[in-house]
């Protein structure tokens, strides 16, 4: 955890110097994004070592599943406040800084898998959110964009990070590729597939739970009199 703290401090100094001409609120979004990705890349290496009602959660979840969904909240709030162009800046800045620093916190294979999945999924989230941003239903844009991007992110990350056939990207994780009951359903599959399903389940649940802070923050933005951002072409 000390390494995480050191990385976050280093990240903050880089972010402030690199984006000195950007608004402080956008800098906060960039810092939040980098922090979420760094924490998730570190925590995804650790299964949840608990047994509840006979279910070994180590076969279902890693700790990273509980932090990463916050990245979609950061993206959607930035998109709503500043527009898709600035949201993409946050995604790209978060991607560049977090992947480089993740090489210290995690294995190179985890960093590559995380960076690839993060960049593609977050840019998809920005595009989908922007298409739906003025829907009459306030929750439609964050739910549709975040759930769709979560499916893509989960599929890309866990395949690249743990699939035995992709050993060219880095050494296999023996515990991850070991056969285990698929999401506690009875038939066996590599353990990382259960992690992927568990990760996706947590992300979808988090999308619903994070609607509360999303709604509160959007209300705060409106009360502050922020202007409606231009709809950019996707």
Residue ranges and their predicted role:
Residues 6-7, 11:
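Cysteine-centered motifs
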Residues 16-85:
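Hydrophobic transmembrane alpha-helices
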Residues 34-37, 72, 94-98, 150:
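Residue-level recognition of pore/gate-forming positions within transmembrane alpha-helices
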Residues 37-45, 101-105, 161, 214:
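Structural signal for membrane-spanning alpha-helices in multi-pass inner-membrane proteins
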Residues 85-95, 140-142:
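Cytoplasmic-side transmembrane-helix entry/capping segments in multi-pass membrane proteins
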Residues 98-117:
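Interfacial aromatic-anchored transmembrane helix boundaries in multi-pass membrane proteins
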Residues 111-230:
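Membrane-embedded alpha-helical hairpins and interfacial helices in multi-pass inner-membrane proteins
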């Amino acid at each position: 955890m000390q390494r995480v703290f050191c990385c976050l401090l280093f990240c903050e100094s880089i972010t402030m110097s690199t984006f000195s001409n950007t608004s402080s609120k956008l800098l906060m979004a960039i810092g939040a994004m980098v922090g979420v990705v760094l924490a998730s890349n570190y925590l995804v290496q650790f299964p949840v070592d608990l047994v509840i009602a006979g279910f070994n959660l180590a076969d279902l979840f890693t700790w990273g599943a509980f932090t990463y969904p916050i990245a979609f909240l950061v993206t959607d709030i930035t998109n709503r406040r500043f527009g898709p162009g600035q949201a993409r800046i946050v995604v790209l800045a978060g991607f560049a800084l977090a992947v480089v620093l993740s090489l210290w916190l995690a294995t190179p294979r985890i960093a590559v898998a995380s960076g690839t999945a993060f960049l593609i999924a977050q840019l998809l989230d920005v595009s989908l959110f922007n298409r739906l941003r003025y829907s009459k239903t306030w929750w439609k844009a964050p739910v549709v964009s975040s759930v769709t991007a979560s499916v893509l992110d989960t599929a890309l990350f866990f395949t690249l990070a743990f699939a035995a056939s992709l050993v060219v990207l880095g050494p296999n994780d023996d515990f991850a590729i070991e056969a285990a009951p698929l999401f506690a359903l009875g038939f066996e599959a590599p353990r990382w597939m259960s992690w992927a399903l568990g990760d996706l389940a947590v992300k979808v649940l988090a999308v619903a739970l994070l609607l509360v802070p999303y709604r509160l923050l959007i209300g705060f933005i409106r009360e502050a009199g922020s202007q409606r951002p231009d709809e950019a072409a996707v």
